[in-house]
Swiss-Prot record:
A GO MF term: G-protein beta/gamma-subunit complex binding
Protein name: Guanine nucleotide-binding protein alpha-7 subunit
The entry's keywords: GTP-binding, Lipoprotein, Magnesium, Metal-binding, Myristate, Nucleotide-binding, Palmitate, Transducer
Binding site for GTP: 40-47, 174-180, 199-203, 268-271, 324
Organism of origin: Caenorhabditis briggsae
Alphabetical list of PANTHER family matching this protein: GTP-BINDING PROTEIN ALPHA SUBUNIT, GUANINE NUCLEOTIDE-BINDING PROTEIN ALPHA-7 SUBUNIT
Annotated region described as G5 motif, given as residue ranges: 322-327
Residues engaged in binding Mg(2+): 47, 180
SUPFAM superfamilies for this protein: P-loop containing nucleoside triphosphate hydrolases, Transducin (alpha subunit), insertion domain
Region G1 motif, annotated ranges: 35-48
Length: 352
């Protein structure tokens, strides 16, 4: 009886040792996984940043991937023109040439028939429309209605997109917009660590899903679009997009969920902001602004507005000004961010 008890005790100790070793191994593995959340309002550029991470740190996009997004390119291009044509009616803007009415009817008929193929006839009609003074005037007022940021890019490239031999480029892919629903994830290895980057849809209806991603987060990259200071939300056509972004940043930055988490702020679409700020004053969003109407001073003011919302004296907000469609710019910024996250992770592990 005593012999059996002794044998059982030894077996129990061996089992406990194996369990302890597995726990230590699991803890070591978990410390080597860096979980990043990409958060921000809808259309801020989160999905584009995620695509850039795949290009820069994973296997990029194959030829098949590029060919598969051709219908999305066509759809984005056609719907961009459709948005302008609808806005012309509501803003009561006349076409520069009467013949453009017939061209616009072809665009409406194509969408109504659910045939979003960029045929030669449709492409030529859209090119004529895009060069029409009335259409250009309507596009200039694009902050007054809803239209994708990529509209000008795709419409400028209509001759290339409508070529029979057209294959989308990586830049075309970066410019495409598909509303993010649910959770999208990219995994990549860097300097012995596994980065798990998660993008969740930013529209109000999607934010309830964010809670499922909050566990074991190492850092948050919050993305806000600089160029949307004079635009309203697609969801309600009423709320200012920049004010919505500030409100969302406030709630996330000061949430108890993220009290000990590194916070990175990307003020995105600086290229579009540079074009817009010369003709649309920042006071549209911030009536109290008294500074110069130039890119640098206005961006610094917007950055200050975000940083003022941080109520923790222990937390530093790491801010970067980005253009999500510029791979070189994103690489420079991401390298700095990831190096900072790695250094702080090693410090938390007691390795530096």
């Amino acid at each position: 009886m005593g012999h059996c008890t002794s044998k059982d005790q030894k077996e129990g100790k061996r089992l406990n040792r194996r369990i302890d070793e597995q726990i230590k191994k699991d803890q070591s593995m978990s410390l080597r996984i860096i979980k990043l959340l990409l958060l921000g309002a809808g259309e801020s550029g989160k999905s584009t940043i995620l695509k850039q991470m795949r290009i820069l740190h994973k296997d990029g996009f194959s030829q098949q991937d590029l060919e598969m997004i051709r219908p999305v390119v066509y759809s984005n291009c056609i719907h961009s023109m459709l948005s302008i044509l609808r806005a012309m009616f509501h803003l009561q803007i006349e076409y520069g040439e009467p013949d453009r009415v017939r061209d616009s009817q072809l665009v409406f008929a194509t969408v109504h028939a659910n045939k979003e193929e960029l045929t030669e006839e449709l492409a030529q009609a859209m090119q004529r429309l895009w060069h029409d003074p009335g259409v250009r005037e309507c596009y200039r007022r694009s902050n007054e209605y809803q239209i994708d940021d990529s509209a000008k890019y795709f419409l400028d490239n209509l001759p290339r997109l409508s070529s029979p031999s057209y294959v989308p480029s990586e830049q075309d892919l970066l410019r495409t917009r598909i509303k993010t629903t649910g959770i999208t994830e990219v995994l990549f290895e860097l300097k012995g660590l596994t980065f798990r980057v998660i993008d969740v849809g930013g529209q109000r209806s999607e934010r309830k899903k964010w809670i499922h991603c909050f566990d074991n987060v190492n850092a948050i990259i919050f993305i806000s679009s600089l160029s949307e200071y004079d635009q309203t939300l697609r969801e309600d056509n009423c709320t200012n997009r920049m004010q919505e972004s500030l409100k969302l940043f406030d709630s996330i930055c000061n949430s108890p969920w993220f009290a000990d988490i590194h916070f990175i702020l990307f003020l995105n679409k600086k290229d579009l902001f540079a074009e817009k700020i010369v003709r649309s004053p920042l006071t549209v969003c911030f009536p109290e602004y008294k500074g110069q109407q130039n890119q640098t001073e206005c961006i610094n003011y917007i950055q200050w507005k975000f940083e003022q919302l941080n109520r923790s004296s222990q937390r530093e907000i790491y801010c970067h000004h980005t253009c999500a469609t510029d791979t070189n710019n994103v690489q420079f910024v991401l390298d700095a961010c990831l190096d900072m996250i790695i250094a702080k992770n090693l410090k938390s592990m007691g390795l530096c």
